Every structure is written in structure tokens, then in C-alpha cells.
């Protein structure tokens, strides 16, 4: 009805206004810091102080760059999801390719990245085991996996392990991204998917994350008719020994 259309439009306008206000707030913080550092640089008396101020400016530029990139991604999501044609995506090949890229470009200070794909019982006509297929946008699904792996890396020690696992759960394909980090505060298991969620691990380089990565994951997964959530991993003594992100997507060949 016309009333429903009006209410929907009002909600969309409110959402855009809220997002714009959030963006303005997030952009203002590094800009204010950068302006202060630039103004102070002129009066710095020692090279050590000048170096500290240049570091602050560099960090703020990194933060702005990350923010602008992720804001651009978010602003494109709705348009891409509503107009793009969903195609059959081979998740098995997608994950294998992405992990190969990580391993090929892996730096010494990164944790070990492991891939474990549980084979399907369903076989193709040529006798080979079928990969996992979903209907969707390959680029967006790849971004979900990349964001989750990058998030796991940021919470991991360089000698730690990250596990990416894929298996069937009923009529869904389940992707798990697990790390051996400090875990997630129990009261933040849902809010970590909010826009501009800002809690980061101690010691992480400033500006590496915008607080939008997990929100992008949720938007993409929701648009694919799936589900994403986070949980902690516990040992036998009920101590948190890591975090697990779970993505569920409808299988395309069922």
C-alpha cells in the first residue's frame, strides 16, 4: 500500500541520515588529530618531537584511507545487491584460491593459515566429489572471507593458527573462521557487527581497521539469504582460547 511504501521510504531516509552522521563523526576524529599535529609541527623544537608528530599524521592518513575505502564499499553494496545477477559460485574453488594468495604473500609476522574442507558425499557424473556451490556474487562473498581472515589475523600472535573450515550443515554450507586470540567479550558478540565498532586488540597498528569490516560481512551474508554470527572457543577448563566466526549460506544444488 501507499502507506507501507511511505514508511519504507522514511526508514531508508532515516538510515541514510544516520549513516551520514556516523561517517561525519568518524572522519572528524582523524582530521582533528591531523590538524592539531600539523599546527604543532611548526613549533616542535627537537627532531624526536617532529618525528612523533609525523608518525601521528601518517597514522591519521592511514585511518582516513581505510575509512574511505570501507565507506565506499558499503555505499556500493545495496546497489550491487539489488541490480546484479546472482550466479552459481564455487565456494570450494573460491576458498582454495584465496588461501593460496594468503600463503603466497604471507609475511614472516603473520600466523599460520590453515584450510580444511570436509568433502561432500554428493558426486558429479565424472565420479569426482562435488564442490560446494551457492548462488550469489563471487566478489562480495570473497570480500566476506577476506574481511574475516584479516580480522582473525589482527587478533592472532605471529606463531598462532587460523583455521578456515567448510562443511555442510543440513541444506546450508557452513564456513568457519577460527583464531587463537583473546576472544570476544560476551556482551559484544552481537554488537561487533555494528557499523564503526571500534574495540581492537592491544598493539595493533593504528588505522588498519575502520570498524566497518564485520558490518560489510553481515550485509553481504544477509543479502545472500544466509546468517553470520560469532562465538568464543573454550578449552576444557572453560577458558576462552579464541574466537569463531560462523557463516551459513544456502546450498545452490539442493
Please give the residue ranges for each predicted region.
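Amphipathic coiled-coil signaling helices used for dimeric signal transmission
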Residues: 1-15
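Short alpha-helical segment of the dimerization/phosphotransfer core of two-component systems
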Residues: 14, 59-64
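Conserved micro-motifs of the catalytic ATP-binding
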Residues: 79-84, 125-136
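A conserved beta-strand-to-alpha-helix junction within the catalytic ATP-binding
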Residues: 85-100, 117-125
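Short helix-loop "hinge" at the ATP-lid/N-box region of the Bergerat-fold HATPase_c
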Residues: 152-153
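Short conserved segment of the HATPase_c
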Residues: 184-196
